UniProtKB/Swiss-Prot annotation:
Species: Prochlorococcus marinus (strain NATL2A)
GO molecular function: flavin adenine dinucleotide binding; tRNA (uracil(54)-C5)-methyltransferase activity, 5,10-methylenetetrahydrofolate-dependent
Role according to the record: Catalyzes the folate-dependent formation of 5-methyl-uridine at position 54 (M-5-U54) in all tRNAs.
Species lineage: Bacteria, Bacillati, Cyanobacteriota, Cyanophyceae, Synechococcales
Reactions that this protein is recorded to catalyse: uridine(54) in tRNA + (6R)-5,10-methylene-5,6,7,8-tetrahydrofolate + NADH + H(+) = 5-methyluridine(54) in tRNA + (6S)-5,6,7,8-tetrahydrofolate + NAD(+); uridine(54) in tRNA + (6R)-5,10-methylene-5,6,7,8-tetrahydrofolate + NADPH + H(+) = 5-methyluridine(54) in tRNA + (6S)-5,6,7,8-tetrahydrofolate + NADP(+)
Record-given protein name: Methylenetetrahydrofolate--tRNA-(uracil-5-)-methyltransferase TrmFO
């Protein structure tokens, strides 16, 4: 069998794990660097691969939603990460949420046991030599030494934003005399625990939250404490106005406790409905751990315990993990990388995952899949691929690359991370007025393209060039 150049992957997060697996599955040897546990990051709690440091949710599951379409594209492309997410999913209404411990452990075991993947548990302090095919998948918590080398290589100032994680509590510490199980609008199973607030308890909670003590930022962080809008700390939301949380994570619409009476009786509904509702989502398959949805925070731990125990039903909450905030680094990718995820000035170097400025777990996986697939093709001497912009993976890649689709971003001072959304897809050939039907058309078009791509890749893998 023909011997191909090996590929180095730096970082065993979601993108790096996916990339390494795709490369090895193509018959190429991989050296995978992961600095944990030898060197810990500010946000990770374990040394497992693909650890989820923020939420345990990959977003909406339905493929007529942007996040769900991205997941479905990755399923079609045989993503190891999405396969494990499906395997270790936990009830979460219409979302794909996972038992984060089992999920990460399974990916670690699968990747580590692949005969073509060599794991090096050490920091990679600098970029490998130019002849070595390399994927940078170090994520938003790139080590200082490597970040410095990347900065020197790109000649660009680093970009960053602040991200935060929600607290996790034990299920047995929830008071179900007040809290109750339900899903919004009673759709599907009652997968969420809901803690209702009346107007008085909400006002008191808001008052304490906006004056609570926050964990101190380092001096260099204070200068530019930018937050990503999709993951704002709850205290930052509260400071925007007393009603802001009620139109965000504490939205009460569509949530009803049967103990309050008949939801169809308007007089009862007006009298009993909650002013605000805090929701908790299951963290593990056994239902022993629950996270506070939307409660990313940078409050001091003592303040978290004091204030979050003000939530009805959580007065005796036992905290397994407190919320934390950390600095996320990403490159100004529209100036630096191609739609193949190769650096313009070094074709043997790829970037993948949140380092490129995509936002969300599935988007990181998508970057890992594309970078891994292209690195394997490059190692075999074959042409790399770009994905159609009508697919969610292709649209996200175009947004963070120097393609025509991202020229609108190229000259802006502040390039900011982008989550999966239908707004970045090109218009349909037909006019569809109904939004839900329009999203289904986007989905059908994207999945047709992805299936064609899958067939093309299968043809490439069976080509005589690869024997």
């Amino acid at each position: 069998m023909k011997e191909y150049p090996s590929v180095t992957v730096i970082g065993a997060g979601l993108a790096g794990s996916e990339a390494a697996w795709q490369i090895a599955s193509a018959g190429i040897k991989v050296t995978l660097f992961e600095m944990r546990p030898k060197k810990k990051s500010l946000a990770h709690h374990t040394s497992e691969f693909a650890e989820l440091v923020c939420s345990n949710s990959f977003g909406a599951l339905s493929s007529d939603r942007a996040a769900g379409l991205l997941q479905e594209e990755l399923r079609t492309l045989q993503s190891i990460v999405i396969n494990n997410a499906d395997k270790y999913s936990v009830p979460a209404g219409g979302a794909l949420a996972v038992d984060r411990s089992q999920f990460s452990l399974s990916i670690t075991n699968e990747v580590s046991s692949h005969p073509l993947i060599t794991i090096i548990r050490d920091e990679c302090p600098c970029l490998p030599k130019a002849h070595q095919i390399t994927i940078l998948a170090t994520g938003p918590l790139t080590s200082e030494l490597l970040a410095k080398d990347i900065k020197e290589f790109t000649g660009e100032k680093e970009c960053h934003f602040f991200d935060a994680a929600s607290p996790i509590i034990t299920g047995e510490s929830i008071d179900f005399l007040t809290a109750f199980r339900a899903s919004r609008y009673d759709k599907g199973d009652a997968d969420y625990v809901n803690c209702p607030m009346n107007e008085d308890s909400y006002i008191k909670f808001h008052s304490e939250l906006i004056k609570a003590e926050q964990a101190e930022l380092k001096d260099f962080e204070k200068e530019s404490a930018n937050f990503f809008e999709g993951c704002l700390p709850i205290e930052q939301l509260a400071k925007r106005g007393i009603e802001t949380m009620r139109y965000g994570p504490l939205k009460p619409i569509g949530i009803w406790d049967p103990r309050w009476g008949d939801v169809n009786d308007k007089s009862i509904r007006r009298l009993k409905r909650a002013h605000a509702v805090v929701q908790l989502r299951q963290e593990d398959k056994a239902g022993k751990l629950w996270n506070l949805v939307g409660f990313q925070t940078n409050l001091k731990w003592g303040e978290q315990k004091r204030i979050f125990r003000m939530i009805p039903g959580l007065s005796k909450a036992e905290f397994i993990r407190f919320g934390v905030m950390h600095r996320n680094t990403f490159i100004e990718s529209p100036k630096l990388i191609e739609p193949t995820l190769q650096f313009t000035n070094r074709k043997t170097l790829f970037a993948a995952g949140q380092l490129t400025g995509t936002e969300g777990y599935a988007a990181a996986v998508a970057g890992g899949w594309l970078a891994g697939t292209n690195a394997a093709l490059l190692a075999k001497g074959l042409d790399t691929i770009t994905l159609p912009s009508s697919t969610m993976i292709g649209a996200l890649t175009n947004f963070v690359s120097n393609s025509q689709a991202s020229l609108r971003v190229k000259n802006k001072k502040n390039f900011q991370p982008m989550p999966a959304n239908f707004g970045i897809l090109p218009e349909l050939d037909i006019r569809v007025h109904n939004k839900r039907e329009r999203y289904k058309e986007y989905r059908d078009r994207a999945l047709r393209q992805i299936k064609k791509l899958r067939e093309t890749l299968l043809d490439k893998s069976s080509s005589p060039t690869n024997i």
